[in-house]
Structure formats: structure tokens, C-alpha cells
Amino acid sequence: MEKVPMTAEGYKALDEELKRLKTVERPAVIAAIAEARSHGDLSENAEYHAAKERQGWIEGQIAEIEDKMARAQVIDVSKLSGEQVKFGATVSLIDEDTEEEARYQIVGEHEADVKAGRVSVTSPIARAIIGKETGDVVEVNTPGGVKAYEITKVEWV
């Protein structure tokens, strides 16, 4: 079983989503199925078929989240330190061409949200900077071509 690295915050978010699916969504869809059944003939009952489809989706989501949580390797970022970039680090970069600053935290795949400054450990930018240190310049293959970034800061927040 392959372990899935994730931050404690990512694990907590998965746990909250799982609880919501089990305590809110699952009972609601069961009630919707019961309501649709009460309307009689199920062969032409669109409400029933829609509710059953939704139930299948919810059960799939629950199974997927439970699998991720079972395989989770939770990494407590607050206990990490050092200048070398690794999973969980928050890294400040400067684009060598445009002088634009960027700040990203390296997180697990399901936690990634570029707009919130979280990039997947498997993303091109993360793969390029992992193992590097403050002051290093890295080249990243982007859809727009190769870009050079200087690592200006490594934080553990």
C-alpha cells in the first residue's frame, strides 16, 4: 500500500469532509430515495434515479476519502526545520526574468490549491525545488517554457 504524504491540516480537512458526507449527505440522499419510492413506479421515476445516482457518487467519495486517510502519512510541518526544501516547506521564490515574487507550500496532491499558495509535491515547481536551499537557482519546465527561480526563503509554518 503506497503511503500518501499530507499535512496535518490536509488530513483534518479530509476527516471533516468524510464526516459531512456520512452525517449530512448520506442521510439526505437516503431520505430522497425513500421519498421518491413513495411516488410509486420506479421504472419511470426520475427523482428516484437521480437520488440513486447521487447516492452512488456519495458512496464513491466516502470510499475514496477513507482510502486516502488509510494510506496517509501525516507530516507535522511544525516539527520540521532547516534550509533544505522538502515536503511541507513554505518556499519564497523570485522569478529571475520578471522579478516577481511567489510563495508556495509543498503539500500532498489532494491538498494542492495554487490560488491559495499550495502546490502538489508532484508538481513541476515542487519537483524542481525539493532538495534545494536558500540562494539556489532552479529551472522549472512550465507550459510557457523554462523559467528560472531563485529560492529566497524556506519556512516551516
Curated annotation (Swiss-Prot):
InterPro entries: GreA/GreB_C_sf, TF_GreA/GreB_CS, Tscrpt_elong_fac_GreA, Tscrpt_elong_fac_GreA/B, Tscrpt_elong_fac_GreA/B_C, Tscrpt_elong_fac_GreA/B_fam, Tscrpt_elong_fac_GreA/B_N, Tscrpt_elong_fac_GreA/B_N_sf. Keywords: DNA-binding, Transcription, Transcription regulation. The keyword Transcription regulation applies. GO terms for biological process: DNA-templated transcription elongation; regulation of DNA-templated transcription elongation. GO terms for molecular function: DNA binding; RNA polymerase binding. The keyword DNA-binding applies. SUPFAM superfamilies: FKBP-like (SSF54534), GreA transcript cleavage protein, N-terminal domain (SSF46557). It comes from the Bacteria. Necessary for efficient RNA polymerase transcription elongation past template-encoded arresting sites. The arresting sites in DNA have the property of trapping a certain fraction of elongating RNA polymerases that pass through, resulting in locked ternary complexes. Cleavage of the nascent transcript by cleavage factors such as GreA or GreB allows the resumption of elongation from the new 3'terminus. GreA releases sequences of 2 to 3 nucleotides. Belongs to the GreA/GreB family. This is Transcription elongation factor GreA.
